[in-house]
């Protein structure tokens, strides 16, 4: 499945020919290189290992340097992602935005903004307690335990805690515009993550559903 490693630049808006304003997210792509391949014969499935954004020399270990010695004029990469089912490229090839011309919808994966420690109402959208004067609690989450049996709170119970900073995928985002000169695409709607965070852009899996 076709995919690239990009960077979220931010949001803006564009006007369609009929005058409708569309909110879009700008995704910018540094050069994506194929740094490895997996084949059905050797690994049991076909895949390409893609890398993007050069890594500083001081942060590159010897084993990693050894892997890149086989690749000519390609520096070690900070972000390395495996895309299954993708063929037609060899190690060392640069993958451009050309394939996006044939794709209308994409799935984008990123890391959500970290919100820190938050209460149950903000974190899980709980209703809270009565807001009137006589109530003893207003933003409490309510009971979390059981009776004598099992006499414990189950793992995974929705409670207050650290919010955000999780991997999230938004599906079926429409590609509004492709700017090959600036190596960027505009997609309709919001994308998880802060400005400058890296995202994975793949061809949509569930188009038409």
From Swiss-Prot:
Q: Which keywords accompany this UniProt record?
A: Ribonucleoprotein, Ribosomal protein, RNA-binding, rRNA-binding
From which residue to which does any coiled coil extend?
Answer: none
Question: What Pfam families does this protein's entry cite?
Answer: Ribosomal_L3
- Disordered: where is this region? 127-151
Note the superkingdom of the native organism.
Bacteria
Sorted alphabetically, the Gene Ontology cellular component annotations on this record are: cytosolic large ribosomal subunit
Q: Name one GO molecular function term.
A: rRNA binding
Q: Which GO terms describe its biological process?
A: translation
Its assembly, as annotated, is: Part of the 50S ribosomal subunit. Forms a cluster with proteins L14 and L19.
Family statement:
Belongs to the universal ribosomal protein uL3 family.
Q: Which PANTHER family match?
A: 50S RIBOSOMAL PROTEIN L3, LARGE RIBOSOMAL SUBUNIT PROTEIN UL3C
This chain's function reads: One of the primary rRNA binding proteins, it binds directly near the 3'-end of the 23S rRNA, where it nucleates assembly of the 50S subunit.
What is the protein's given name?
Large ribosomal subunit protein uL3
Q: Which organism is it from?
A: Borrelia duttonii (strain Ly)
Q: Which gene encodes it?
A: rplC
């Amino acid at each position: 499945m076709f995919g690239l490693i990009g960077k979220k630049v931010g949001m803006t808006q564009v006007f369609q020919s009929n005058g409708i304003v569309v909110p879009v997210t700008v995704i910018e792509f540094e050069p994506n290189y194929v740094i490895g391949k997996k084949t059905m014969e050797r690994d049991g499935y076909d895949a390409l290992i893609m890398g993007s954004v050069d890594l500083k020399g001081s942060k590159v270990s010897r084993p990693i340097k050894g892997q890149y010695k086989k690749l000519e004029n390609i520096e070690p990469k900070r972000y390395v992602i495996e895309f299954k089912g993708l063929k037609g490229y060899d190690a060392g090839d640069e993958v451009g935005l050309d394939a996006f011309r044939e794709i209308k919808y994409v799935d984008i994966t990123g890391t959500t903004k970290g919100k820190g420690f938050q209460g149950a109402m903000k974190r899980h959208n709980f209703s809270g307690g009565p807001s009137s004067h006589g109530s003893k609690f207003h933003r409490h989450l309510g009971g979390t335990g059981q009776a004598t049996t099992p006499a414990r709170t189950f793992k995974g119970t929705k409670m207050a805690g650290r919010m955000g900073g999780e991997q999230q995928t938004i599906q079926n985002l429409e590609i509004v515009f492709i700017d090959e000169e600036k190596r960027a695409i505009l997609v309709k709607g919001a994308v998880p993550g802060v400005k400058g965070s890296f995202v994975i852009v793949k061809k949509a899996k569930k188009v038409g559903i």
